[in-house]
């Protein structure tokens, strides 16, 4: 079946085990704030989706289906252990395969993105798409608007999915203290690299740590004969981003 059947763009659907090129917007010369502001002025719904992607690293489908009131829940409703509490409120995201993850609303950017989205929708149970259209049409409209502003591989070398890459790369940098391999960062201690990659995978909604390689690039740590893969996982097909 085609990517469109699953509500995914080609870039989201294709398998990439290890990123060899930085697909983030900033790495390709895109002024992120300027583009998002322009899109918000043109179409507040698509602009709100972009703000959600930038704040939480969502897939475009997740951003369109996000319900800015119903999807915000107190920590007590997440089922996470008390020691994992990072915020009073969390965004409940239903990802691919029905997997649910909870993203802490622990920064001004995340809180502002949700507040903006709440100001756009017309009801407490609304999502970020046009309620008169089905998901496929809403996703096509999202793509149309981004194409209008030059967010294509042909024009700027990036896609909407590249904004998700931007967020996940930045998340790794914040935890590891350096850029990931795909952005030419320095080598870091194996355990620190593993912890940062695990956190990236969790934020992205992937079950396996190996999936982080699709955004960050290959692990660059010293390996010894007979050791397991540097990410500590057995060989397996990469997950779709």
What positions do the PLM features span?
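Flexible interdomain linker/hinge and immediately adjacent N-terminus
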Residues: 1-35, 94-96
């Amino acid at each position: 079946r085609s990517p469109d059947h699953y509500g995914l763009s080609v870039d989201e659907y294709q398998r990439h085990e290890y990123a060899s090129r930085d697909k983030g917007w900033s790495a390709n010369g895109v002024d992120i704030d300027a583009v998002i502001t322009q899109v918000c002025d043109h179409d507040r719904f698509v602009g709100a989706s972009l703000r959600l992607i930038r704040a939480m690293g969502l897939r475009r489908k997740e951003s369109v289906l996000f319900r800015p009131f119903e999807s915000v829940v107190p920590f007590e409703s997440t089922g996470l252990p008390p020691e994992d509490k990072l915020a009073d409120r969390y965004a409940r995201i239903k990802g691919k395969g029905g997997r649910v993850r909870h993203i802490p609303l622990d920064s001004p950017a995340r809180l502002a993105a949700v507040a903006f989205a709440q100001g756009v929708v017309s009801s407490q149970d609304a999502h970020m798409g046009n309620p008169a259209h089905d998901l496929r049409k809403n996703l096509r409209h999202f793509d149309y608007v981004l194409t209008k502003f030059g967010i294509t591989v042909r024009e700027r070398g990036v896609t909407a999915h590249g904004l998700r890459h931007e967020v996940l790369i930045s998340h790794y940098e914040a935890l590891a203290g350096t850029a990931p391999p795909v952005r030419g960062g320095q080598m870091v201690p194996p355990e620190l690299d593993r912890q940062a990659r695990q956190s990236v995978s969790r934020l992205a909604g992937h079950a396996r740590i190996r999936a982080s390689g699709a955004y960050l690039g290959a692990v660059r740590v010293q390996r010894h004969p007979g050791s397991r893969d540097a990410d500590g996982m057995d060989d397996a097909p990469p997950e779709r981003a």
